[in-house]
Amino acid sequence: MHAEEKLTAETFPAAPERNATLEGKNKFLGFWLFLGGETVLFASLFATYLALKDKTNGGPSAEELFQMPVVFMATMLLLTSSLTSVYAIYHMKNFDFKKMQLWFGITVLLGAGFLGLEIYEFNEYVHEGHKFTTSAFASAFYTLVGTHGSHVAFGLLWILTLMIRNAKRGLNLYNAPKFYVASLYWHFIDVVWVFIFTVVYLMGMVG
């Protein structure tokens, strides 16, 4: 079946990511290799943070600094966005392009809300004198959490680009795997944040 062939809900494959074009399958493999590299990157950042988290240089500790209500709200937004992306892929596999776009749109809004809260959080810390150069702890914290934030921004841009570029095309075997891969990437970002929330924030609050 070619990407250009007219598809219907009856002929659209249940797992379009497995019925992609050869080019799409190669990109799918490349994505998993990319994700492996991303995992190594974040593992190294976590290791660095754990090694430096007590090096406050007389500045505030994690327990004194973190604003948990803001962090909790941001966490809920990001976790909910993971659920909405699941709904988007569900509708994609049922060949309902409009509902897929709707749920991806909600995912983008939730992700943007998460980023907004993270920027607010960083701004508050800076105003309290907790800057990147304040201590080794501060540098490790901003590097880890900021790197994740940049990945969230990239994921939002990726999903938005797919939504806009394919708004008039609808679903086919060429673009369906792209939406699927973008959703997988978004789940990866969410999983990384769960580790950040646990290791950085929760463990930081208990000392």
Swiss-Prot record:
Main location: membrane
Residues passing through the membrane, by range: 28-48, 70-90, 102-122, 144-164, 186-206
Record-level Gene Ontology MF annotations: cytochrome-c oxidase activity
Gene Ontology biological-process entries: aerobic electron transport chain
Keywords of the record: Cell membrane, Membrane, Translocase, Transmembrane, Transmembrane helix
Name assigned to this protein: Cytochrome c oxidase subunit 3
Location(s), subcellular: Cell membrane
InterPro entries in the record: Cyt_c/ubiquinol_Oxase_su3, Cyt_c_oxidase-like_su3, Cyt_c_oxidase_su3-like_sf, Cyt_c_oxidase_su3_a-hlx, Ubiquinol_oxase_su3_dom
Cleavable signal peptide: none
Organism in which the protein naturally occurs: Bacillus sp. (strain PS3)
Entry-linked CDD domains: Ubiquinol_oxidase_III
Topology of this chain in the membrane: Multi-pass membrane protein
